[in-house]
């Protein structure tokens, strides 16, 4: 070992092939904890940039409607930038499909084209405009946990994303850019820890 080397000078790394079919990137959903406007006001703020599709529910239909909402988000989100929205005290889920006029141009940087970048710029910055509001956002990889936090009052709004594709991560890295904050959750995680 080199002179002066200490064990704390090293970092544990795991290298995996990007093409490995077992390598998955899970979405990192946002849950706001600061007060948000009513749904009508949120709709007015977002309707110019997004096509909104509402999934209203009752206590008896909430589970089935939630499943339809998540399926619509996953299926349609493969074609266009799309997000999911749920607000505390509101009995509907909403998908937000970015209108063509507001999508990044083909020559935009790979980072600018990411769903997570678009969500941050167009939705989070609109609903949580101050740094303090953005710092109070909670994160989860689980759709149902995000929606449950809002239903139970832990959060005021859930913003659901589709997962970043491994190819998108590669494109950002190849362009010499950094991924946005909380944009990837690689799975499976390597086992770490101490054995005693």
Where do the PLM segments sit?
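Surface-exposed, charge/polar-rich loops and edge strands
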Residues: 1-196
């Amino acid at each position: 070992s080199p002179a002066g080397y200490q064990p704390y000078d090293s970092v544990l790394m795991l290298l995996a092939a990007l093409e490995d079919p077992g390598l998955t990137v899970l979405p990192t959903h946002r849950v706001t904890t600061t007060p948000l406007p009513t749904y009508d006001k949120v709709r007015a703020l977002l309707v110019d940039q997004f096509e909104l599709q509402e999934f209203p529910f009752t206590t008896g239909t909430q589970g089935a409607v939630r499943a339809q909402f998540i399926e619509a988000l996953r299926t349609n989100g493969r074609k266009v930038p799309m997000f999911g929205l749920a607000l505390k005290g509101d009995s509907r889920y909403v998908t937000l499909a970015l209108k063509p006029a507001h999508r990044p141009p083909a020559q935009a940087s790979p980072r600018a084209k990411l769903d997570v970048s678009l969500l941050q710029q167009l939705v989070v910055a609109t609903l949580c405009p101050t740094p303090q509001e953005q710092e109070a956002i909670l994160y989860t990889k689980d759709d149902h946990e995000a929606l449950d936090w809002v239903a139970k009052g832990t959060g005021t709004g859930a913003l659901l994303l589709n997962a970043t594709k491994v190819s998108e991560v590669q494109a950002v890295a190849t362009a010499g850019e950094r991924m946005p904050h909380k944009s990837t959750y690689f799975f499976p995680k390597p086992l770490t820890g101490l054995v005693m």
